[in-house]
Amino acid sequence: SDVYKRQEITKSDQYIKVKQQHIDDIKLKYHRTHGDRVSRHQLAWNLFKANETFMNDSAIHYLNECIALSRQMKNSTLLQSDYTALAHQYAATGFYNEALDYLRRIDRPQLKGQQIADYYFCCSHLYGEMGYYLKDEALKQQYYGLSNRYRDSLFSVLPSTSSLYLWRKVIAAASAGYYRRAMRYCDIWMNQVEENTPEYANMAFFRSEI
């Protein structure tokens, strides 16, 4: 109904207003922080996360700020995380050549813990997306194969109770036509995310696709 539509538009407007205020607050801290590169990097990273699904150009801008700060600090560990995040941001928004370029800059043997999971997730996502848009069937299957191998590697390092693990299991099961299995994973996933959060919205979207 028109009333429902107006309510949803109002909710959306309120969300954008609150989101923008949150970003402006972090931005103010960022511009007031001088000299302390560690703090500036954390604030730039927070600005990336705040813009990740909100304003792509801003997300990329602040990741480049993170990369510049990591280089200035000669902090290779932070730099690997920055490269992975930027590769994934490009992959998620359709800039596949840029994503591949930043993936190639990552020093894979140097990655540890969560960095390994993030890397596998990025690779699986990127090659899956590239495969989807390829016209050549042989190349398409090659890229899907790469995506699946990185997905399996991701499963091997993630706890089976993590939201990311359950998310990818939902996609894998649904893609293979195992819809009941996908729904079971989705039920577990739903119990782990809070309502009215981006994580819940992500779960609800994939649940609606099963």
Residue positions per predicted region:
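Membrane-proximal low-complexity regions enriched in glycine and acidic/polar residues
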Residues: 147-210
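Short, small-residue-biased leader/transition segments that mark boundaries at the very start
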Residues: 3-4
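Post-signal peptide N-terminal segment of secreted/secretory-pathway proteins
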Residues: 23-118
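Helix-turn-helix repeat elements of alpha-solenoid scaffolds
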Residues: 13-27, 52-65, 92-104, 137-150, ...
